[in-house]
Swiss-Prot record:
Each subunit contributes two pore-forming domains 1 and 2 which assemble to form a single pore with M2 and M4 transmembrane helices lining the central cavity and M1 and M3 facing the lipid bilayer. The transmembrane helices are bridged by the selectivity filters 1 and 2 that coordinate the permeant ions. Up to four ions can simultaneously occupy the selectivity filter and at least two elementary charges must translocate across the filter to convert it into the open conformation. InterPro entries: 2pore_dom_K_chnl, 2pore_dom_K_chnl_THIK, K_chnl_dom. This is Potassium channel subfamily K member 13. It is found in: Cell membrane. K(+) 3 binds at G112, G239, F240. K(+) 4 binds at T110, T237. The lineage of its organism: Eukaryota, Metazoa, Chordata, Craniata, Vertebrata. The keyword Transmembrane applies. It comes from Rattus norvegicus.
Amino acid sequence: MAGRGCSCSPGHLNEDNARFLLLAGLILLYLLGGAAVFSALELAQELQAKQRWEERLANFSRGHNLSREELRGFLRHYEEATKAGIRMDSVRPRWDFTGAFYFVGTVVTTIGFGMTTPATTGGKVFLIFYGLIGCASTILFFNLFLERLITVIAYVMRTCHHQQLRRRGTVARDNRKAPRKGEADSLAGWKPSVYYVMLILCLASVAISCGASALYTTMEGWSYFDSVYFCFVASSTIGFGDLVSSQNAQYENEGLYRFVNFFFILMGVCCIYSMFNVISILIKQTVNWILRKLDSGCFPQCQRGLLRSRRNVVMPGNIRNRCNISIETDGVMESDTDGRRLSGEMISMKDTNKVSLAILQKQLSEMANGGPHQTSTSSRDDEFSGGVGAFAVMNNRLAETSGDR
C-alpha cells in the first residue's frame, strides 16, 4: 500500500500484503462479532439445560438410592458407547459397507459429521493417508465442476446477450455474413457479471435445499426448518453432526432414498462451494474499495509521480518501486479505460469501480512477476500466474475477474 514518494503511507507495504492484512483484520472482527451474537443467543439456553440436567440427575440418584459418583461413572460408559456408534434407538450399523461408504463420503468432502469415527489404530492411520489424497482430489473435482458451471452459465448468458444485440440491431441478423469489427468486439469482449452468476448459483442452491428438505421431512421425521438447516450445514461442509441423514435402521424404499440423499448432498456441496467462491470475489472487491479509500489522501501527488515516471521510458523501474495502491489503480485509469471501451468488455459496476478493480487485478499479476509482462517472460510456464484454486478457475471468465491473478 505504500511506496517511496508517498509520505502518508508508512513503510513499503505492497498491495498484496495490504489486502492480506486488511482481510485478516476484517475476519478477526467478523469472528468477534459472531462470537458475541451466538453467545447472546445460546448461553442462556445452555445454562438452563445444564440446570435441568443436574435436577434430573439428583432426582434419579435419590429415587434409586444411587450415589452421584456411581451414576456419573455409568454415564461416562454411555458416552464411550455413543462415541463407538451405539445408540439407544435402533440405527443401522456404522461400519458395514454402506455405512463405511457414507463415512468416506463425509471424509473426502470434508463434511465430517462426526457421528462415525475410526476407533482402531489402523483405522486412524489409514484415515490420515486416505484423507490426504481424497480431500485433495475432491477439491480438484469441485474446481472442475465450478469451471464447467461457469462455462455453461457464460455460454447461456452470452447467447442471451447476442439475442439482445440482434433485437437492438447491433448485430446483423444474417449469420452467414462476416460480422463487422464493432459486432465482433461487442461479443468477443463480453463477459457475464459476477452478480448474475451469484444469483443463478443462489437460486440453484435454494432449489436443491428445498427439494432435499421436503425429502428429509418425510423420510427422517424432521421439521422443515431443521431440514433446511441440515442442508446448509452439510452442503457448506460445516458438518456439526447434530442432524445426520440416512442413519435409521430401515427406510421405505431404502435403496432409492440413500441414492437420492447422496445426490442431494453432492449437488448441494458443489453449488454451495461454487457460490462461496463467487461471493469471495465480491469480498475481494470490498477489500480493494476499502484500501482505495484508506489511500485516497495521497492519491494526487502519487498519481502525478506515476505519470511522470511513465513518460520516462529509460527508467521503467520507478513504476515498480512505487507500489502504492493508488499508483497501481488510478494512475493507469485513463489508458486502460480506453482499451476496455474498445474491446467492448462489460463490467457491471459503477464508474468509480469499473476500471479500478480490473487494474488492481492486472497490477497484482504484474507485481507478482516483477513488473509488467514482457514478451520474453510471457512464454514461461508459471503454474501460479493465473491464480490458485477457484480464483484460477474464474480468472478472465467473469467481468469482474478480467485480468485477475
